[in-house]
Design a protein with these regions (language model features):
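Catalytic activation segment of kinase domains across protein kinase-like and atypical kinase folds
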Residues: 198-230
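ATP-binding glycine-rich phosphate-binding loop
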Residues: 10-53
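ATP-binding glycine-rich loop module of kinase domains
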Residues: 35-37, 41-94
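Short, solvent-exposed loop/turn segments that connect beta-strands within catalytic domains
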Residues: 53-54, 83-84, 99-104, 216-222
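Protein kinase-like catalytic core scaffold
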Residues: 56, 87, 106-108, 203, ...
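Protein kinase catalytic-loop region centered on the HRD/HxD motif
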Residues: 185-202
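Short acidic, low-complexity intrinsically disordered linear motifs used
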Residues: 1-8
Length: 230
């Protein structure tokens, strides 16, 4: 994959775009090695900065249209109303690749965000005040408040009524509804019956402290749910 192909000015998303490039994943991470800065990794992707695009991050991953991350960013960018939701990531471009051997990979250019865990606790409390009616701290826990936030987000996305009712920010409710609906559609939970249908959907939610990040704004730190599904 030629990483420079996504370093041109951002274009509208084309989820069906595919180019047959041998060794796509390997080439993506070596073509611009001198300009890339490693930011982090997950099970199937790595994230890089590029010195010529300081406001962007580039996620290079293995997978095709069935990849849960690609499904998420495509849905999040599907219409103007969702694109304006501050809790969803801002996606600048996406390119999908397949090589002759059948392997698939992708490069997604997204806004560069800050780690949620780097916030001071006062900033986390400000986020809690804006987003939730209440979120008491467990007096027996020494964990940072970020863990309370992600647990509340995970439970709301999973459809627990008490967690949903505790959210006062309508934009956050919208974002979590999008995430929950994608999880259901990906795993066909809506077509299943029986006692484990809802639990199957919940199993595929993956909202944790590494998959929630921060966008700096004029009114403070804004939560962004970056990669909530497995």
């Amino acid at each position: 994959m030629k990483l420079f192909e996504v370093l041109s000015p951002p274009k509208p998303l084309r989820a069906d775009a595919a180019s047959y490039v041998p060794d796509a994943f390997r080439r993506a991470t070596t073509k611009h090695k001198g300009n890339l800065g490693y930011l982090g990794r997950g099970a199937f992707a790595q994230v890089y900065s590029h010195k010529n695009r300081p406001a962007s991050a580039f996620k290079v991953g293995i997978g095709d249209g069935d990849n849960t991350y690609l499904k998420y960013i495509e849905r999040a960018s599907q219409n103007e109303r969702w694109k304006s939701n501050p809790y969803l990531p801002r996606v600048h471009s996406q390119k999908n690749y397949k090589d002759p051997g059948g392997g698939a990979s992708y490069v997604v250019e997204i806004e560069k965000l800050e780690p949620f865990m780097d916030l001071e606790q006062e900033e986390v409390e400000a986020i809690i005040d804006r987003a939730f009616h209440s979120l008491p701290k467990d007096k027996y826990s020494d964990l940072p408040r970020q863990y309370d936030v992600v647990e509340a987000l995970q439970r709301a996305a999973a459809g627990y009524s008490d967690a949903i009712k505790n959210i006062k920010d309508k934009k956050l409710l919208q974002a979590l509804a999008i995430i929950g609906n994608i999880g259901k559609s990906l795993y066909s939970v809506g077509k299943k019956t029986g006692p484990y249908a809802r639990e199957n959907a919940r199993m595929h939610l993956d909202i944790h402290t590494s998959n929630v990040m921060i966008r700096r704004t004029s009114v403070g730190a804004q939560l962004v749910i970056t990669d909530p599904l497995v």
